[in-house]
Amino acid sequence: MSYESVARRYGRAIFEIGKETGTLAALAREIGDASAMYSASEELRLVLDNPLIPEASREELLRELGGRAAFSDVTKNTLLLLARRRRLAALPEIARQLALLVDQDQNVARAVVTSAGPLSDGYLDRLRAELEKATGRKISVTHRQDPSLIAGVVTQIDDQVIDGSLRTRLSSFRDNLLRT
């Protein structure tokens, strides 16, 4: 089931509360942490999503988890509201939507850089600087390795992909040879 539209509404509401109270970064971190806890534990999901378990028991469990994690009242109340409305399964998407809103608010773009092998920190810093200059936004870089690229780098920012991999160049070269 897709929770994207529900998650957008909850994400927007949490974002606005965070902006109004000056706690946006903390709320985003807490919602992300709550999402990670929910996603990581199948047992927790089974208990929290089970309609046969009394609502009071589920809420008690959420209060205890929120207390142990030192979540703010806003985060704890959000989790309780999601539980009452049977929408806890939307929590990972809510966290994602909230992170997108925070990035947009702070003019941050997330770049995924994929290379065949490891890249030095210096190279990633230079790449980040060039991407920031090209986009006019602050860039957060995540590096991944994919040996199938052979050599080169593939960079993805939002929906834009810059493919400088040897695999793509060889594939393009092969296609050109076959056409002639």
From Swiss-Prot:
GO molecular function, one term: proton-transporting ATP synthase activity, rotational mechanism
Alphabetized InterPro entries for the sequence: ATP_synth_OSCP/delta_N_sf (IPR026015), ATPase_OSCP/dsu (IPR000711)
Bilayer topology term: Peripheral membrane protein
UniProt xrefs under Pfam families: OSCP
Keywords linked to the UniProt accession: ATP synthesis, Cell inner membrane, Cell membrane, CF(1), Hydrogen ion transport, Ion transport, Membrane, Transport
GO cellular component: plasma membrane; proton-transporting ATP synthase complex
Compartments reported by the entry: Cell inner membrane
Source organism, top-level taxon: Bacteria
Subunit structure: F-type ATPases have 2 components, F(1) - the catalytic core - and F(0) - the membrane proton channel. F(1) has five subunits: alpha(3), beta(3), gamma(1), delta(1), epsilon(1). F(0) has three main subunits: a(1), b(2) and c(10-14). The alpha and beta chains form an alternating ring which encloses part of the gamma chain. F(1) is attached to F(0) by a central stalk formed by the gamma and epsilon chains, while a peripheral stalk is formed by the delta and b chains.
Record-stated family: Belongs to the ATPase delta chain family.
NCBIfam families listed in its UniProt record: ATP_synt_delta (TIGR01145)
UniProt-listed PANTHER family: ATP SYNTHASE DELTA CHAIN
Record function comment: F(1)F(0) ATP synthase produces ATP from ADP in the presence of a proton or sodium gradient. F-type ATPases consist of two structural domains, F(1) containing the extramembraneous catalytic core and F(0) containing the membrane proton channel, linked together by a central stalk and a peripheral stalk. During catalysis, ATP synthesis in the catalytic domain of F(1) is coupled via a rotary mechanism of the central stalk subunits to proton translocation. This protein is part of the stalk that links CF(0) to CF(1). It either transmits conformational changes from CF(0) to CF(1) or is implicated in proton conduction.
Protein name: ATP synthase subunit delta
Organism of provenance: Sorangium cellulosum (strain So ce56)
